[in-house]
């Protein structure tokens, strides 16, 4: 008897304080685009409008939704995919025990109950990628959906995808995903990595981490599982994921050959690509730029090759003294990708793992190859984004962005940070968010989060929260710096609430309302403190904002401009000082 992953075992449903789920009707029947609406209280009887913000949480924050993990979440894209008439259902490959890294299927593994569903693929001769549609002048339902989320015209979305400046990762076998876009002319996105390892985590925990990450604002999820039950864990995640899901297929392929890199073959890897594409993975990290001739260059590095995928392929290349089979079979990979609309995330297997190695010959040699591969993928109308570093000091960050835009013809950049210093284990979410904010400002389209556990261990649920929030700050700061037309609205609303001492509105408008309230209540827990005109930092006498209010009130009472009120008040105080005898200490 197979076990099940019960929703009661883990925390899935939740909402953020002062918020409600709302839906914007799209141009097609039944299209409903989710937003989160943050209510605000009045200011002296004058209403403050609610603020609508981008929402990644899926149905889990909808009070009307009943969580049934065994059924998966709704599939808003299913009718759109079938309606285009260019896909077919087929039997698909047989799921084998080795897909989960075992010789014999375990009775205790909670297999997803709808494993008998038939996958979809493109009909013979068809190409079902969003890039293919865009290049043929077609605005898809997914593009219309994205346009509403981003506050732009559908034609702008189509053009950005057609020209390769943005990707809309949307595997036809992941109809549960709410369409989103990754490109430098849209909101900066954040990816959260989850996944088990050989020594830690369960299927239930990974499903919970996925919903937890999206609750806090993760735009995509990467399942980087390397332990047992890789296939089954991924199935549970995808069927319940409202955001695109990415993977690094070489990890699972390695498990299929018992962890021995030199035993990898193109056939095993190809089978793994098809397996994951049939499940609904939206983008693959593929380390096709780690070429045999680049590997010796890394020998003089401080930290060598730090990418798991990069080191696996380097080991294979050296053992066989052959060129990377991901590079030599790249056209065949493109043929698979366009049958399912899986996007490339071209991996930076030679990224620097220390600031000493930043912007070195190995890193930029690989980038040149990724530019070459981008052109090949685009020839097949397959969507591409480029992965970037890594560890880079602040003064070298801009060069990375400029080179990527030039060499990779403007394809979206997707970076891990970068970390701006190597001396802060336990705080690498901060060292990397500094670099992430900078490179996001310069044009990076998506930031891969870093948690406090980076370099130390597998992140838990709280680490995921910290990592996502830290990177939402970096992404939002970049949006502000780039002048995104709606980015400042939430900042302005929170600043107004702060100045008016609307404490609950301050909490609710923040990226992490619960943490903000928790910190406030540590020193001022009483309910009355939620309306007080001070906090515990300065107290009632020294609150700068309360003093500002007093100045404004004084100006109003004396029919003065604020600057005049300050001058008048200063003169009055000067006279008081003279009348008291002009003594410094009374």
From Swiss-Prot:
Binding locations of [4Fe-4S] cluster: 535, 538, 543
Cofactor binding note of this UniProt entry: Binds 1 [4Fe-4S] cluster per subunit. The cluster is coordinated with 3 cysteines and an exchangeable S-adenosyl-L-methionine.
Pathway info: Cofactor biosynthesis; thiamine diphosphate biosynthesis
Region span, Disordered: 1-59
Enzyme's top EC category: lyase
Residues that coordinate or bind Zn(2+): 391, 455
Cofactors that this protein relies on: [4Fe-4S] cluster
Protein name: Phosphomethylpyrimidine synthase
Family: Belongs to the ThiC family.
Enzyme Commission designation: 4.1.99.17
Keyword 4Fe-4S: yes
Organism of derivation: Bacillus cereus (strain ATCC 14579 / DSM 31 / CCUG 7414 / JCM 2152 / NBRC 15305 / NCIMB 9373 / NCTC 2599 / NRRL B-3711)
Entries under Gene3D superfamilies matching the protein: 6.10.250.620, Radical SAM ThiC family, central domain (3.20.20.540)
Residues the entry annotates as binding substrate: 193, 222, 251, 287, 307-309, 348-351, 387, 414
Basic and acidic residues bias locations: 22-39
Listed GO biological process terms: thiamine biosynthetic process; thiamine diphosphate biosynthetic process
Gene name, Swiss-Prot/TrEMBL: thiC
GO molecular-function terms, A-Z: 4 iron, 4 sulfur cluster binding; carbon-carbon lyase activity; zinc ion binding
């Amino acid at each position: 008897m197979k076990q099940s992953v019960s929703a009661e075992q883990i925390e899935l449903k939740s909402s953020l304080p002062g918020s409600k789920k709302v839906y914007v009707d799209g141009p097609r029947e039944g299209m409903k685009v989710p937003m989160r609406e943050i209510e605000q209280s009045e200011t002296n009887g004058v209403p403050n409008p609610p603020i609508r913000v981008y929402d990644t949480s899926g149905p889990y924050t909808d009070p009307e939704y009943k969580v049934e993990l065994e059924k998966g979440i709704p599939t808003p894209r299913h009718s759109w995919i079938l309606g285009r008439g260019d896909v077919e259902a087929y039997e698909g490959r047989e799921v084998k025990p080795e897909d989960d890294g075992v010789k014999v299927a375990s009775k205790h593994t909670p297999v997803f109950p709808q494993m008998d569903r038939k996958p979809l693929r493109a009909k013979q001769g068809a190409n079902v990628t969003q890039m293919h549609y865009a290049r043929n002048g077609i605005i898809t339902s997914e593009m219309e959906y994205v346009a509403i989320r981003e506050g732009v015209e559908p034609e702008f979305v189509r053009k950005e995808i057609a020209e390769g400046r943005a990707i809309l990762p949307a595997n036809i076998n992941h109809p549960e995903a709410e369409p989103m876009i990754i490109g430098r002319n849209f909101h900066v996105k954040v990816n959260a990595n989850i996944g088990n390892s050989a020594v830690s985590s369960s299927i239930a925990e990974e499903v919970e981490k996925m919903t937890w990450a999206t609750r806090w604002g993760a735009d995509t999820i990467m399942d980087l599982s390397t332990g047992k039950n890789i296939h089954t864990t991924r199935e549970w995640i995808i069927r319940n994921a409202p955001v695109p899901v990415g993977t690094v297929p070489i990890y699972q392929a390695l498990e299929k050959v018992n962890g021995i890199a030199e035993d990898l073959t193109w056939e095993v890897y190809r089978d793994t690509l098809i397996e994951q594409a049939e499940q609904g993975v939206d983008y693959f990290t593929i380390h096709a730029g780690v070429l045999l001739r680049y590997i010796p260059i890394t020998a003089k590095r401080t930290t060598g090759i730090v990418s798991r995928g990069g080191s696996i392929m380097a080991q294979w290349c050296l053992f066989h003294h052959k060129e990377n089979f991901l590079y030599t079979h790249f056209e065949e990979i493109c043929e698979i990708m366009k049958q399912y609309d899986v996007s490339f995330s071209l991996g930076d297997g030679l990224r620097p793992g220390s600031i000493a190695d930043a912007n070195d010959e190995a890193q930029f040699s690989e980038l040149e190859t990724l530019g070459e591969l981008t052109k090949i993928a685009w020839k097949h109308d397959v969507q591409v984004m480029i992965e970037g570093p890594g560890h880079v000091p602040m003064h070298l960050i801009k060069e990375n962005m400029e080179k990527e835009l030039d060499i990779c013809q403007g394809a979206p950049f997707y970076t891990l940070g970068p970390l701006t210093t190597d001396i802060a284990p336990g705080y690498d979410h901060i060292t990397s968010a500094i670099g992430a904010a900078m490179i996001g400002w310069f044009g990076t389209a998506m930031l891969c989060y870093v948690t406090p556990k980076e370099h130390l261990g597998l992140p838990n649920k709280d680490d995921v929260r910290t990592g996502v929030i830290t990177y939402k700050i970096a992404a939002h700061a970049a949006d502000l710096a780039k002048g995104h037309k709606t980015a400042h609205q939430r900042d302005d609303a929170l600043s107004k609430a702060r100045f008016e001492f609307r404490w609950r509105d301050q909490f609710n408008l923040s990226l992490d309302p619960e943490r903000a309230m928790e910190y406030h209540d540590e020193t001022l827990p009483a309910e009355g403190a939620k309306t007080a005109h001070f906090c515990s930092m300065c107290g009632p006498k020294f609150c700068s904002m309360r003093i500002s209010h007093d100045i404004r009130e004084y100006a109003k009472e004396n029919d003065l401009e604020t600057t005049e009120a300050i001058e008048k008040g200063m003169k009055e105080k000067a006279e008081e000082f003279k009348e008291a005898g002009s003594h410094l200490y009374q």
